[in-house]
Amino acid sequence: TELGTDPNAKTPSSSSSASSALSSSSSSSASSPBHRKPMDEDDNQV
């Protein structure tokens, strides 16, 4: 019961929450600087 209720309910919840937050944060954060860096560099170099 413990392995099927406590850890099971906590694992997927934590994984889902962490995955969603990490994916969203990483994607948004990486997308913002990634797109800004190359654009700024290109604009500056050109």
From Swiss-Prot:
Residues 13-32 have a biased composition (Low complexity). Keywords: Phosphoprotein, Storage protein. Phosvitin is believed to be of importance in sequestering calcium, iron and other cations for the developing embryo. The keyword Ribonucleoprotein does not apply. This is Phosvitin. Phosvitin, an egg yolk storage protein, is one of the most highly phosphorylated (10%) proteins in nature. Residues 1-46 are annotated as: Disordered.
